[in-house]
From Swiss-Prot:
The keyword Chloroplast does not apply. Belongs to the globin family. Heme b binds at H97. Monomer. This is Hemoglobin-1.
């Protein structure tokens, strides 16, 4: 992964801040994603049992989804210097999402929202965009 040391440090430190607040931040991230991309929210209709978008933020299903996503991003951040682990994680992630009919474009949209969202936690949007690009480089071939 061709990230500078400063980019990696920023991603790690900003993720530590966001992760510590993820009980609140996680649902906020997903609501930002859903508000920006109705097509992504539609992919969660089974999880939320067809509930309206405005009603899902404080549900147990949202809490579980947010924690699952936190674990995924934490694994990616923890392995920024371990290309083999990242590649394996990305292959599994791609297979799981492809099986649910989620497109590479929808994943890219989620990464874009995440990059902007992380600014609230001291994240550099360019660093997060670089990480997203590197991850998508491993995800896209498996979609």
């Amino acid at each position: 992964m061709s990230l500078s040391a400063a980019q990696k440090d920023n991603v790690k430190s900003s993720w530590a801040k966001a992760s510590a607040a993820w009980g609140t931040a996680g649902p906020e991230f997903f609501m930002a994603l859903f508000d920006a991309h109705d097509d992504v929210f539609a992919k969660f209709s089974g999880l939320f049992k067809g509930a309206a978008k405005g009603t899902v933020k404080n549900t147990p299903e949202m809490a579980a989804q947010a924690q699952s996503f936190k674990g995924l991003v934490s694994n990616w951040v923890d392995n920024l210097d371990n290309a083999g682990a990242l590649e394996g994680q990305c292959k599994t992630f791609a297979a799981n999402h492809k099986a649910r009919g989620i497109s590479a474009g929808q994943l890219e949209a989620a990464f874009k929202v995440l990059a902007g969202f992380m600014k609230s936690y001291g994240g550099d949007e360019g660093a997060w965009t670089a990480v997203a690009g590197a991850l998508m480089g491993m995800i896209r071939p498996n979609m």
